[in-house]
Amino acid sequence: YNVPDHTIDRARSGYEVYDDGNKGFVIAQFYPRMAVYSDVEGWQNSQFWGRDEFALPFGDFDVSITVPADHIMDATGVLVNRKEVFSKEMMRRFERATQSFDAPVMIVTQAEAEAAAANGVANGIPTAKKTWRFKAEMVRDFGFATSRRFIWDMMAVKIGNRDVMAVSMYPPEGNPLWEDWS
């Protein structure tokens, strides 16, 4: 899979190069799909074209993605190796976010994202890597986002009898709008 520059063709998946030379990746619809049979239209075998959608069955995903160690990442499902990929401070903030039902908790602040971006540009291509592992059950698709430049916040939300995490990841250019409305 060749990751496209989504600023050229406006695809919903791809990378964007920021003014400082760093990239942000938002990756979806990147793996082969099985055709779906519908009793209304028969076999749905159209490939994805731009803004169209697939007819996808529900499935389970267990995905490991290796990225530069200074990147943060989130994806469909649950991060199952959080303690391996989060710093101690990120873990403390995450634990606080799981109890914060009234306001988002910053997992990665703007200052931290900007410092990571500056270090990434100064140090060139990183050699250290981290593997993030996500599991998702009964979902139609899997996607992920990663960058060293992302600000990251989380907040617990009660849906029925379950607590889930509402998550926002965005580059510093998204502020103050995203931080105010996340």
What kind of feature is each model-predicted range?
Residues 13-34, 82-84:
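Short edge-strand/loop segments of extracellular domains
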